[in-house]
């Protein structure tokens, strides 16, 4: 129970961290790409 609980917590933490990181990375990448090509969302 303790191990599975810890793994579940780690999975949720990693999922949230990856989601936020990917969102921020994509936002920054797309924003930079849009600016470099003069594209507005």
From Swiss-Prot:
Coiled coil: none annotated. The keyword DNA damage does not apply. Residues 9-32 are annotated as: 7 X 4 AA tandem repeats of W-M-D-G. Keywords: Repeat. Sequence repeats lie at residues 9-12, 13-16, 17-20, 21-24, 25-28, 29-32. This is Uncharacterized protein C03B1.10. It comes from Caenorhabditis elegans.
